[in-house]
Amino acid sequence: LIDIHCHLLYGVDDGSKSLEESVEMLKIAKKQGITGIILTPHLRHGMFKHPLEKIERHYKKLMPYANKLGIELKLGTEYHVATDMIDAFHGGLCHTLADTQYILTEYSHSSEYSFVYKMTREAIFAGYIPVIAHVERYECLSDISRIEDLQELGALIQVNADSVLGIDGRHFKRYTKKLLKAGLVDVIASDSHGTKERVCNMKKCYEYVAKKFGDDYAQEIMQTTPENIINGR
């Protein structure tokens, strides 16, 4: 399995607090059968904004531990979308996913659909492929025809493993089930934040999706597509 969205990098957002915790999170990932991870620290104006130099320094410190466990580790960003998004990526202020053409975009719960659509289109025109993070959280996307419209534009749709499993609540489980049934999920990721709360549940989720929606689909959204993202295909 490959996890393209997690907060395993320590000391840069609301995820891992220390190198030790990050190493524990890597061990949990290994037990889940994860072979590749894209670290996606938050970048959000006025809330999470750490110098790239610090992010890259912590990444380098973590690398030997990942190598030892046989996990490929790449850098990315979970970018909370603002109007200067293209400048931020073009200007190298944050990492695309594994330094490919893919970017992980996040919105506010109350974002207007017109804004989500506009910024997704802007990213695509600029040469990026937006992966829209945890779509189940946005009120404006409760109508799944809007998910189809975003996919037609060229975006990929990501949901969280914990939402699929019902850990994040029944509402999210119902919504993600509807998306999975319609074949509208492109990627499932852990969005894990620690070792005690919001832990990685990718293995359990893979088994659930395979049982309910078929092995082929589980493989596509938790192995094949994430692998294409990490390799920039």
Which sequence ranges carry the predicted segments?
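Non-catalytic positions within long, well-ordered alpha-helices that form the structural scaffold/packing
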Residues: 30, 124, 180-181
